Amino acid sequence: MTKTLTKAAEIKVSYHPKNSTNPVIRNSDEAYYHLLRFFPENTISLNERFVVGYLNRMNKLIGVYEVSKGGITGTVVDVRLVLSVALKVAATSVLLAHNHPSGNLQPSEADKELTKKIKEACKLFDISVLDHMILASEGKYYSFTEEGLL
């Protein structure tokens, strides 16, 4: 009797350590500028997306991953995906960002709970959550850090 192993699905990440040209994120304005491009202008008011920016110990943005894309009123975020990519790219911190298609920048209770859940999970691996931002077009955003919620 021979045993066969079943291949498991895996997340593939291209890792290129030469990141001298990667931007350094020093504040919420810079985070907004670099993360907004992952929210297409023609759909930012149509469907909700959740993306994570991954940073190294020098706060250089080493990558961005779209965790989920949902509908008009929400999206589902799997914390395991957030962490699995962070571990694969050896991130020391993360920036969380999502949009509200309604244009309302105030965080919902679900947004606050998700932030807490991700922060607690990241803490187990010594990964910092630098901010969770709710983005809109035209230079508008809500920062959990600036509002004292992180």
What positions do the PLM features span?
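Active-site-proximal loop/helix of nucleotide/amide-processing enzymes and allied scaffolds
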Residues: 1-17, 56-58, 73-150
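Glycine-rich, small/polar surface segments that engage phosphate groups of diverse ligands
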Residues: 19-80, 85
